């Protein structure tokens, strides 16, 4: 009896519905999509779903600021998010919203089951209240210093520096993030999920292989510090689902948000009619459930979520796959620098496959951060996709189309080399399955190098000029095209749009099992350009378009207004200036000048004479003697009527009596270069 193939349900974390998708979000959705596409190519039944996280105070307040209903705002955002993911070829079977009938039904059901099973506790608490806005403040709307590590400007539920969780009342120097007012303490009744009751189950589950080792180790710290009951209540006004039999009380967004996975799948089941919800979510489900998430929401997905499922009679996730953050050019994404790039802005300038490839080339199964270095991005895409892969097709297709009417040879020119490519499929498949995408890409590019070396050695452009060698030419070029086909099959999960164009050229579908049989005596289509090289100008234009536009520029005051920053120079221009630490050995008035002082500067073995216009600020020049300063040492000597000035000392200030000679920190020595 044959074994029944596993069925997979895969999710990404739900984007919050109060803003656009950016390239940080896209890392996760691309990672998951590559994995899903690979599983589908291997014959697995995969259902891939997501939704917008559409509840909470931030959405309520933003809608108020916009003068529209929250429902209207989240509907618009949902459409935009769906459009962005489609533009990046993310192959969701369903993209829904947590503000849905399915999600409300499931949230209510799970809450009532938890309550029936004794896992919901209610008690009166003291909570922070904004006296200006007349509202209780949810934890994300209180800021202050972390009670554990003392980091400033942290939210009221968890610290982004040390990862600790706590209640808003534990914050040091709390303030309302809504109005800035100092909050007051008021009493209110709240409902709590009894998370500590699931401690033993959670400790076993986290060590079962459901989490990466890095994550499981971090969770052990949380277990050792003790789990706390989880407040699942928010007071009106609040945009979300009202708790049954508790007027004016609402489910905290983090209760119904993960249930949104279930709600989106229920919506898909209702649409298709041939999917069974319980087959994937029931306690005895044999299907696999995978969540792709960022490391910032591990606490919710590895503690609250599995405990909620366990306590309400549902199955737990098979695996939670955690990834790191995205930086751009080695730094946090910045609107002012133009590196906070929206998905839609990227798509206005560049091909989605480019980013998919670059992320894949850097992703592993670890939770390390990924840096999107824009110069490296251009170089790698052009080098790998254009020069190594697409060029392999173009340099052979011309001969096949022109000389042989698009017909490939009836036998392989180098069966051993082709078999080497086929043998590589096993390792590449293992790397894709294990989410070690960067390793898979390295294996694929190593094969691409072999393919191009074969073509270089066979030199079809030379063979084409030799009489009587048509059969050799056809065989060589057919071999190159067959190797291109194998490479594109391996890359199909990563580059779906390019793969589609390659399939049109090859006149065949790219399937994992299909590469066992090469294309022999096969008709290919006329070759059309498959992929465009990235122009750095397009990347620069994308960055410019991403810079935050300020409709009403802030009025600049102070020194910057009086002396604006000059035009940008290159690093090479700056590097030409040689600044050195100098010791003022002697300082004197200059006879005949009421502005200049004559300074004798020791550069640690060389003495320079410099005339400087700082007399008005230093009426006693002898007070400068023995002091260290900074001078431009490679400035061309300037002949003055008082003598030759052999450099320039550095000073700040607008002039007159407001001139301030610059000095290095203690420890600097004469002659040291300033870099």
UniProtKB/Swiss-Prot annotation:
CDD domains: Anticodon_Ia_Met (cd07957), MetRS_core (cd00814), tRNA_bind_EcMetRS_like (cd02800). It comes from the Bacteria. Binds 1 zinc ion per subunit. It is an enzyme of class 6 (ligase). GO terms for molecular function: ATP binding; metal ion binding; methionine-tRNA ligase activity; tRNA binding. Its EC number is 6.1.1.10. It catalyses: tRNA(Met) + L-methionine + ATP = L-methionyl-tRNA(Met) + AMP + diphosphate. SUPFAM superfamilies: Anticodon-binding domain of a subclass of class I aminoacyl-tRNA synthetases, Methionyl-tRNA synthetase (MetRS), Zn-domain, Nucleic acid-binding proteins, Nucleotidylyl transferase. InterPro entries: aa-tRNA-synth_I_CS, Anticodon_Met, Met-tRNA-synth_bsu_C, Met-tRNA_ligase_1, Met-tRNA_synth, Methionyl/Leucyl_tRNA_Synth, MetRS_core, MetRS_Zn. A motif ('KMSKS' region) lies at residues 332-336. A motif ('HIGH' region) lies at residues 15-25. Its cofactor is Zn(2+). It is found in: Cytoplasm. Residues 573-675 form the tRNA-binding domain. ATP binds at residue 335. Keywords: Aminoacyl-tRNA synthetase, ATP-binding, Cytoplasm, Ligase, Metal-binding, Nucleotide-binding, Protein biosynthesis, RNA-binding, tRNA-binding, Zinc. One of its GO terms (biological process) is methionyl-tRNA aminoacylation. The keyword DNA damage does not apply. PROSITE patterns: AA_TRNA_LIGASE_I, TRBD. Zn(2+) binds at residues 146, 149, 159, 162. GO terms for cellular component: cytosol. Belongs to the class-I aminoacyl-tRNA synthetase family. MetG type 1 subfamily. Homodimer. This is Methionine--tRNA ligase. It comes from Photorhabdus laumondii subsp. laumondii (strain DSM 15139 / CIP 105565 / TT01). The lineage of its organism: Bacteria, Pseudomonadati, Pseudomonadota, Gammaproteobacteria, Enterobacterales.
